[in-house]
Amino acid sequence: MRFVKESVIRATPERVFAFHEQPDVLSLLIPPWESARVIQAAKISEVGAQAIIETKIFGPITVQWVAQHTVYEPPRLFEDIQVKGPFRSWRHRHIIEPDAEGASLRDAIDYEPPLGFLGRAVAPLLVQRRLERLFEYRHDATRKWCEGESVASGQWPVTSFEY
């Protein structure tokens, strides 16, 4: 299955890529309504590095998600795959390209849900909707940082966003 979210950010591709290279960016990209916490962060610049996130998937069911960085091509692309987690497979490409208004940020995810046929049947209702909400938040957070005053002043880290 595939999920794609694309947004235009009014900043250079280099600035958008630099946002994703910040040490605690993963924590900033977790929406407040998600029951998830970063156990171990990983630099996107280190191919092979693994980030570990503990997240609730349904109700009280918690899983550990291990994502490994597999591609690093600044300032246009980085990629991670799921090594361990809730999906049968997961490949997430973060693509940043020049745009007339700044940069185009595209998250392209190819995934296989768990539970075979049943998982594929419910994915459009459950997984796709959750991804849409999650990546709307992530792109908005990226936009706010890259287009905001923190860029002009060089301030980092931003510790939260107003929603």
Model-derived features: where do they sit?
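Glycine-rich portal/gate segments that line the openings of hydrophobic small-molecule binding cavities
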Residues: 38-84, 104, 137-145, 149-150
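Generic structural detector for well-ordered beta-strands
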Residues: 6-10, 37, 54, 68, ...
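Short, surface-exposed coil-to-beta transition loops
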Residues: 2-4, 62-67, 89-92
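Beta-strand/loop substructures that line and gate deep hydrophobic ligand-binding cavities in soluble
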Residues: 79-133
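Short, basic, low-complexity termini and linkers enriched in Ser/Thr/Gly/Pro
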Residues: 150-163
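Beta-strand elements of well-folded, non-transmembrane domains
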Residues: 9-11, 57-59, 71, 86, ...
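Short strand-connecting beta-turns/loops that link adjacent beta-strands
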Residues: 12, 74-75, 99-102
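Hydrophobic ligand-binding cavity/cleft-lining segments
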Residues: 1-42, 46-47, 163
